[in-house]
């Protein structure tokens, strides 16, 4: 089976409809959310090729296939993350600057900064006494490495 476009997102499907369908899941690493071409296998052993044409990145809950009997949904494997919770705006700016200088991709929400686990970043957080935890957590976006130059 080749998937060329996402049908929708499971968050927009009613429980009434979902309860009538045979659900299969595809589990991918968050880094694969940006891949337009990939081969995956559902939790029921069905092999699927994904070949998206110019579409936005994949998202957790995307419906890869749906008919009157079956639905195949994309899920993300939890990442090993450092969840950083600075105690002040100054501390947030300082740690964000230091992590940015190391070119480490980060994601933010209202009160947390998320980076993929790195023992050197963990040592930096300990040294600067920045509150953090190490957690396995699902992210909605891939961590993107952004190319740049200093010249």
Swiss-Prot record:
CDD domains per record: UreE
Supply the SMART domains for this chain: UreE_N
Keywords carried by this UniProt record: Chaperone, Cytoplasm, Nickel, Nickel insertion
InterPro entries recorded:
UreE (IPR012406), UreE_C_dom (IPR007864), UreE_N (IPR004029), UreE_N_sf (IPR036118)
Under Pfam families, the record lists: UreE_C, UreE_N
Q: Name one GO molecular function term.
A: nickel cation binding
The record's function comment reads: Involved in urease metallocenter assembly. Binds nickel. Probably functions as a nickel donor during metallocenter assembly.
**Similarity-based family:** Belongs to the UreE family.
Q: What is this protein called?
A: Urease accessory protein UreE
Q: Which organism is it from?
A: Lachnoclostridium phytofermentans (strain ATCC 700394 / DSM 18823 / ISDg) (Clostridium phytofermentans)
Upper classification of the organism: Bacteria, Bacillati, Bacillota, Clostridia, Lachnospirales
């Amino acid at each position: 089976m080749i998937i060329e476009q996402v049908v929708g997102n499971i968050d927009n499907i009613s429980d009434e409809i979902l309860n009538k369908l045979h659900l299969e899941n595809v589990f991918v690493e968050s880094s694969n959310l940006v891949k337009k071409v990939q081969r995956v296998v559902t939790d029921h052993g069905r092999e699927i090729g994904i070949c998206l044409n110019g579409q936005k990145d994949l998202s957790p809950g995307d419906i890869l296939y749906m008919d009157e009997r079956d639905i195949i949904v994309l899920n993300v494997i939890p990442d090993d993350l450092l969840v950083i919770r600075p105690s002040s705006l100054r501390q947030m700016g300082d740690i964000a600057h230091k992590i940015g200088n190391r070119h480490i991709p980060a994601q933010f929400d209202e009160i947390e900064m998320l980076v993929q686990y790195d023992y050197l970043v963990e040592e930096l957080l300990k040294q600067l006494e920045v509150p953090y935890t190490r957690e396995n957590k699902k992210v909605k976006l891939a961590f993107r490495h952004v190319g740049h130059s200093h010249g």
